[in-house]
Design a protein with these regions (language model features):
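EAL-family c-di-GMP phosphodiesterase catalytic domain
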Residues: 30, 103, 107-108, 156-160, ...
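Charged helix-capping and loop-helix junction motifs
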Residues: 165-170, 198-202, 251-258
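Helix-turn-helix DNA-binding segment
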Residues: 1-35
Length: 323
């Protein structure tokens, strides 16, 4: 109880000196209570980690952060990590969803995920990243009414983590409208081998029971694995950009896309194509039965200040061929 009071005061902006004077306790006692309280709170609710200074967060010698990861954690606190948003539309360019991606303003450059994510090692780094994007999803679901969803990428290392379940539940609790949970979509990479990660499959089912929609990302990528289709059903499947590109000249890639589109029709799920950057790709995919599209033909990822305009722009139906 004492630890909780100290943490609440910290979140409200009170200094240790102010608390010591008000409570009649030594600063040393309050420091001890604060450290213990932060440790317990972050262990149970990792999504709260960005609210605390990095020096207060628990450290695990077995899972220590690299210097690069420490820079990343500091960047979160310094607001140098920011979201960008890319729309997912139907065949009439009507907004169906928005994927939340991230950028890092680092030493005068804006880095894309493929530049820095391969350097992440510690679970804590992945937890902080996921908590950051989940919080962004909740904020935007609350701010923008509608039926379109916001999707969050789930790192492979967290697929079987109980911390992920706790973070998603915390996110669900922050939604102003309970039905808003249907607008939260989690994207799992198809490179996760669900056959050997039974907890991951159980977690997907548990999240779906809670009302969260789950998408299988990167379908038919170069690192694709076979997922247990009879044990695990996703609400949507997203074609990887590489197979969308290959379908322009490879009949086998075309056959794979057609088979997934047909499976989605039969199983009452959606098939999304990403990397749609030309009218030719859009027309081909549409003819194969794909009805959800993402890519530069419609919009590049946009910064937060452009999100309201993006939502308005794709709220009116029109065929991309009519532009």
């Amino acid at each position: 109880h004492a630890e909780l009071k100290v943490i609440l005061a910290l979140l409200q902006g009170q200094t240790i000196g102010e608390q010591a004077q008000r409570l009649g306790l030594s600063q040393k006692t309050l420091y001890t209570q604060r450290l213990a309280g932060v440790k317990k709170l972050v262990e149970c609710h990792p999504h709260l980690a960005p609210r605390f200074p990095r020096t207060l967060l628990p450290r695990s010698p077995a899972n220590a952060l690299t210097a690069f990861e420490q820079e990343w954690v500091q960047a979160i606190h310094d607001r140098q990590v920011f979201p960008v948003f890319q729309p997912i539309v139907d065949s009439r360019s009507q907004l169906q969803g928005v994927e939340i991606l991230i950028r890092w303003r680092h030493r005068g450059q804006v880095l894309h995920p493929q530049t820095f994510l391969p350097h992440f090692r510690a679970d804590y780094t992945w937890l902080l990243l996921t908590a950051f994007v989940l919080q962004e999803a909740v904020q935007n679901i609350n701010e923008y009414p509608g039926t379109f969803y916001f999707s969050v990428n789930i790192p492979s290392s967290l697929a079987d983590s109980d911390s992920l379940l706790r973070m998603v539940e915390a996110a669900r609790q922050q939604l102003r409208q309970p039905e808003g949970v249907a607008r939260l979509v989690l994207e799992y990479a198809e490179t996760i081998d669900f056959r050997h990660q039974s907890r991951s499959a159980a977690h997907v089912a548990q999240l779906q029971r809670a009302g969260v929609r789950v998408m299988l990302d990167d379908c038919f990528s170069q690192g694709s694995v076979i997922f247990p289709a009879r044990r695990l059903h996703f609400n949507a499947y997203k074609l990887d950009m590489s197979i969308v590109n290959d379908a322009q000249h490879d009949p086998k890639a075309l056959a794979l896309i057609k088979s997934l589109a047909y499976y989605c029709q039969l199983s009452d799920s959606r098939c999304v194509a990403e990397g749609v950057d030309s009218l030719a790709k859009f027309t081909q995919l549409k003819s194969l039965g794909i009805d959800r599209f993402q890519g530069y033909l419609f919009s590049p990822p946009m910064r937060r200040e452009h999100l309201p305009d993006l939502i308005r722009r794709f709220s009116h139906q029109r065929d991309p061929a009519d532009r």
